Amino acid sequence: MTAHAQDGPHEHLRSATTPEAAAGADPGYVGPSNVALLTDLYELTMSDSYFRHGMNERATFALFVRALPPGRAFLVSAGMDTALAMLEGLRFGDEAIHYLRSLRLFSDGFLDYLRAFRFTGAVRAIPEGEVFFPPEPLLEVSAPRIEAQLVETLLLNTMNFQVMVASKAARIVLAARGRGVMDMSPRRDHGSDAALKVARAAYITGCTGTSNVLAGMTYGIPVVGTMAHSYVMSFADELEAFRTFARDFPNNAVLLIDTYDTMHGVANAIIVAHEMAATGGRLLAVRIDSGDLLTQSRAVRSALDGAGLRSVQILMSGDLNEYRIAELLEQGAAVDAFGVGTELGTSADAPNIGGVYKLVEDEKGYRFKLSTGKATLPGRKQVWRRFDAEGQPIGDLIALLDERPSAEYRPLLVPVMAGGRRVRPEPLTDVRRRCTERLASLPDELCALDDAVTYPVTLSPALSALRARIRASD
């Protein structure tokens, strides 16, 4: 632990800013003015040491996941555009420099370097929406050593979270078998920034919309919504609540029918649906949020169909995940769409993916780590994917950058940033389309929720030989 020179070995680092002053100075939001400080302290102390000793030659770091989380057979690339936008705009402003100076840790020369800091490096990456597998490099950063070091925390924070959510969302979308899946997670997400990123990652993987209005404005994602039980309870009775809402929103009303009794609720919804039709409106859907979803959905569908309302859809919500959705559909639930919240936004069964960022090459040659259980692959690399005649992926090859396997392989990592500028920002719709195509191409056995097969990822002969030489020379 780094501490002030006058502190004892057990004293924690303290800044010149008191907790009371800090509490009144900033509400704690992360934005362009302070995101450069969203880093671990040792990134800055290491970088200052590099600066003092003239160690700022070009270096390459790789971001990768060591192993699949429990219950996962594949991962989905997400968060790249967010990360690249942060790299483009990364600045240490006057307030940040003032705070760092107050820590009495950093050399004046290094603080001057930070004041003029701009990220000038290159990034190669597996595009957003693409499926990938450990230990393939998700991205590689090649930049002056200090630049590449300083962005580690920011990249891991951004990529780990969005890959985690996208990979969970993909499983939910696949389990829904073509039925709509809506992100309804903001109130359960781990913070305001997380809620935005969840909506984006979920939309990439095929979710049809989000309840998060800010995400709709920011990313152009369709926004969706129903009503809460509190709305129904705010009126004299359920029928009055439904009628009022239908009058206010005659073209997109979704009625929550389980506040008191689901079958009584659908009876009231049928009354309102006929009243809406008489005035040119149309009831879009009813929502069931509790109880025996399977039995209730069948009964509600029967009631709606019997009333001539076959076009009215049924939306289910209530602690859903891919396992529950698959079970409901297997048992014949009558449902058109799912609203998923907590399980999606927190990836409850696999709440982290353990992505790491490691030095793999610099001007002195290959760099590597041999620690037991944490060994790394040296050198800049490319991932090559092989497909069968039907276009299904059948195996990946991790190779050194200058290797060229046979023509049946397709490279995955592409240039996404050069000279600190994004090469070609992609519209979110294009990323979403790519992900839909990639998920559709996966073999069924890889999409299984349980007991999925292990996808083959191998090392090229040259990379294997290099790793063997390194181990032998240790």
Give the positions of each predicted feature.
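Short active-site oxyanion
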Residues: A253-V254, V312-I314
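Buried, small/hydrophobic-residue-enriched core segments of structured protein domains
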Residues: H4-R58, A67-P69, L105, L111-T120, ...
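Hydrophobic residues within beta-strands of alpha/beta enzymes
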Residues: V224, V286, I314, D336-F338
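An N-terminal, globular interaction/scaffold subdomain
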Residues: A85-L90, A125-E128, F132
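Short coil/turn segments at secondary-structure boundaries
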Residues: Y99, S167-R171, S185, C447-V453
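Residue-level "edge-of-site" marker
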Residues: H229, S317, G341
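Gly/Ser/Thr/Ala-enriched C-terminal appendages of enzymes
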Residues: T2-E57, P70-R72, D305-A307, V312, ...
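N-terminal, Lys/Arg-enriched amphipathic/low-complexity engagement segments
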Residues: A59-R115
